[in-house]
């Protein structure tokens, strides 16, 4: 991704957060955080990664709501960011946060088991 695409992506991320948080009134759309926006080099397409607070059903409902509002969101982006052509938007759930949380949970579990093993060894020595 080139420098211009990166800059456009960062600006879109900021604007999308504002649009989704303030302009959209769809009840299906829950608490959404825009985690990343990746714009293609030709600025024709933008993949928007989102994180949704809630269960799998809430995530799917939020995605459906965002898909329905895609045209409105794109027109808002077009008004806020001066580009020859506003990129086509694709929404995806960002799994990296959940993946990171799972790894952290496993590390804690291993650490706890390791601490438990050390205490057992100390008790045996006494």
UniProtKB/Swiss-Prot annotation:
Asked if the keyword Cytoplasm belongs to this entry, the reply reads yes
* Gene name for this UniProt entry: rbfA
Establish whether keyword Cytoplasm is in the entry.
yes
What is annotated about its quaternary structure and interactions?
Monomer. Binds 30S ribosomal subunits, but not 50S ribosomal subunits or 70S ribosomes.
Indicate where this protein resides in the cell.
Cytoplasm
Q: Name one GO biological process term.
A: maturation of SSU-rRNA
| Gene Ontology cellular component terms for the protein in this record | cytosol
What task does this protein carry out? One of several proteins that assist in the late maturation steps of the functional core of the 30S ribosomal subunit. Associates with free 30S ribosomal subunits (but not with 30S subunits that are part of 70S ribosomes or polysomes). Required for efficient processing of 16S rRNA. May interact with the 5'-terminal helix region of 16S rRNA.
Q: What is this protein called?
A: Ribosome-binding factor A
Among NCBIfam families, the record links this protein to: rbfA (TIGR00082)
Q: What is the lineage of its organism?
A: Bacteria, Bacillati, Bacillota, Bacilli, Bacillales
Keywords of the record: Cytoplasm, Ribosome biogenesis
Q: What is its main location?
A: cytoplasm
